[in-house]
């Protein structure tokens, strides 16, 4: 009878230790922010000239230039991660009052130095690139939008002050 109680106590200690390890692993594997690399994508703080680009459905949109703030997403039809990210893009753009543009245009990817897809670029109302990065989750897209909003506000303060 005493042996059973000892085994039960040992089992309880093992369960608590495993639960702690699972928590540590979850913290280590938490989603990371979007990867912003300086030499990938259009330069931050610059306004690339407006260009025509093909969307996924074959229509043409104008990318860049002054206008409403924009969330530009580069995707490919053969990209499974793109298919996972696409449904969350309208919500991320709409929550920040950004116009969503989803393009699949190899020429624009080359001109903008896009390293791979899915890649997101956030423009302010002046057409200036405020954030950019490779994404694979809604959290990363939201992080880029937040960074863009913060950088645009800082730029406004500099212009005003």
Residue ranges of each PLM-predicted region?
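Long, leucine- and charge-enriched amphipathic alpha-helices
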Residues: 1-40
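Non-catalytic, surface beta->alpha helical segment in thiol-disulfide oxidoreductase systems
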Residues: 121-159
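N-terminal "domain-start" segment that seeds a small globular fold
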Residues: 27-64
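Structural alpha/beta surface segment adjacent to cysteine/selenocysteine redox centers
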Residues: 99, 109-119, 125-126, 131
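Thiol-based oxidoreductase modules, predominantly thioredoxin-like and allied folds used
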Residues: 91, 95-108
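Short active-site neighborhood of thiol/selenol oxidoreductases, capturing the structured segment around
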Residues: 60-89, 141
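Catalytic cores of nucleotide-enabled group-transfer and carboxylate-activating enzymes in metabolic
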Residues: 57, 89-92, 120
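Non-catalytic interaction/Regulatory regions outside core domains
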Residues: 67-69, 84, 153-161
């Amino acid at each position: 009878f005493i042996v059973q109680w000892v085994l039960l106590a040992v089992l309880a200690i093992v369960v608590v230790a495993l639960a702690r390890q699972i928590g540590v692993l979850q913290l280590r594997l938490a989603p990371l922010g979007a990867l912003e690399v300086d030499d990938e994508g259009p330069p931050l703080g610059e306004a690339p000239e407006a260009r025509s680009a093909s969307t996924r459905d074959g229509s043409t949109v104008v990318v860049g230039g002054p206008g409403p703030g924009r969330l530009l997403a580069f995707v490919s039809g053969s990209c499974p991660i793109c298919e996972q990210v696409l449904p969350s893009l309208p919500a991320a753009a709409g929550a920040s009052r950004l116009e969503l543009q989803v393009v699949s245009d190899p020429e624009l990817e080359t001109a903008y130095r896009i390293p791979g897809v899915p890649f997101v670029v956030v423009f302010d109302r002046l057409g200036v690139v405020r954030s950019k990065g490779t994404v694979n989750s809604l959290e990363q897209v939201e992080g880029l939008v937040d960074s863009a909003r913060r950088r645009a506000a800082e730029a406004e303060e500099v212009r005003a002050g």
